[in-house]
């Protein structure tokens, strides 16, 4: 297994970069990274992963996984896991409607993405929260298209006027019309994936053109603890068969859906990501994967995740190190805050975690524009 070397950190788009290669941050030693890796392999071998998808469960069984059909659990051997890691693509480029606008993964670039959409919106006039609207989405798409350092544009709003049953398809259409950059929208159902891929085929110029120049990656979120969801697997299958990359990122939550220690959370998070990698490579060997290291801690007062905690930043740095151990480009949840409005708290929490993630060498930083959880 080829460990990914720490690359020079650059800001901005190709041709306009700011080098920060002389500064780096880490929180784990090499032996600690290996300990987490070994613990994840034990989890997958002994506890296994629950797979809510009959076809995928059978596919894993055919590949040598031990299947507990009564409980829909697949137990994965070290060989199956590491062979899948070796097969996975680890560098790729997403292209915008204007192919000069690119988001490059695995090249050491600093990729920022505006949020694919939230249900609530902080009104700029009242500073109060309200339901997001279609006008908010249009404004956010225009803003993301105009901001030089945003590489991937999201709608930032889930407008209440658009029925949820086809909202992701509708917003995909608005994105490809409203920006010439790569874009992303949230997908929740396999049927929506069919329509979204058809939109991008039309923009790219057909099936072959989209394969040659990918324009969209899907995001699969394993459900902690240790589950792969049916809808997510339906979507992944359609995307990898269309030759598009996949980002795999569970939101394991310390003391909630993951162990009460950060190390335990990292081991579980890593196991869930590796299980997703195995599935992508069984479906389409060579599929490019981004390692979505996005664990959080639970605020025991509210029982929801904390976006602005110190632990959030520490685990983000650790996840970069673990992703580099396997050679994957890495996406982390930093640049977030627990503040409910854009204020000093928001600036401090966002800035601190974003800086640490950047200095650790992450590839992508998502959900720019979010306040609160």
Where are these regions (language model features)?
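Acidic, His- and aromatic-enriched active-site or binding-groove loops in soluble protein domains
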Residues: 175-182, 267-278, 315, 355
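C-terminal catalytic subdomain
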Residues: 340-373
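Short glycine/threonine-rich loop-to-helix capping motif typified by GTGT followed
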Residues: 261-265, 301-311, 341-351
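Phosphate/pyrophosphate-binding betaalpha-module
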Residues: 275-331
């Amino acid at each position: 297994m080829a460990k990914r070397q720490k690359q020079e950190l650059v800001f901005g788009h190709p041709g306009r970069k700011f080098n920060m290669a002389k500064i780096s941050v880490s929180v784990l030693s090499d032996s600690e990274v290996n300990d987490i890796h070994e613990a994840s392999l034990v989890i997958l071998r002994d506890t296994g992963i629950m797979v809510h998808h009959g076809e995928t469960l059978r596919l894993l069984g055919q590949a040598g996984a031990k299947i507990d059909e009564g409980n829909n659990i697949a137990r994965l051997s070290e060989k199956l896991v590491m062979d899948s890691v070796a097969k996975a693509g680890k560098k790729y480029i997403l292209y915008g409607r204007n192919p000069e606008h690119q988001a490059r993964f695995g090249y050491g670039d600093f990729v920022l993405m505006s949020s694919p959409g939230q249900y609530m919106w902080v009104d700029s006039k009242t500073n109060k929260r309200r339901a997001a609207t279609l006008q908010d989405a249009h404004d956010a798409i225009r803003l993301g298209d105009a901001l030089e350092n945003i590489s991937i544009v999201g709608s930032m709003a889930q407008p209440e006027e658009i029925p949820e049953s086809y909202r992701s398809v509708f917003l995909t259409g608005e994105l490809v019309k409203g920006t010439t950059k790569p874009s992303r929208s949230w997908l929740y159902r396999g049927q929506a994936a069919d329509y979204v891929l058809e939109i991008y085929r039309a923009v790219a110029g057909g099936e072959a053109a989209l394969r040659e120049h990918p324009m969209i990656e899907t995001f699969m979120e394993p459900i902690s603890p240790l589950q792969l969801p049916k809808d997510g697997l339906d979507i992944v299958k359609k995307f990898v068969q269309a030759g598009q990359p996949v980002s795999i990122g569970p939101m394991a939550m310390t003391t909630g859906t993951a162990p009460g220690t950060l190390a335990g959370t990292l081991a579980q998070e890593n196991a869930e990501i590796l299980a997703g990698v195995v599935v992508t490579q069984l479906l389409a060997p060579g599929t490019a994967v981004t390692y979505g290291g996005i664990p959080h801690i639970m605020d025991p007062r509210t029982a929801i995740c904390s976006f602005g905690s110190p632990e959030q930043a520490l685990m983000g740095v650790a996840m970069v190190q673990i992703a580099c151990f396997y050679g994957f480009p890495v996406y982390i949840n930093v640049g977030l805050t627990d503040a409910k409005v854009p204020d000093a708290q928001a600036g401090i929490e966002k800035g601190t975690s974003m800086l640490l993630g950047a200095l650790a060498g992450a590839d992508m930083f998502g959900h720019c524009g979010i306040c609160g959880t």
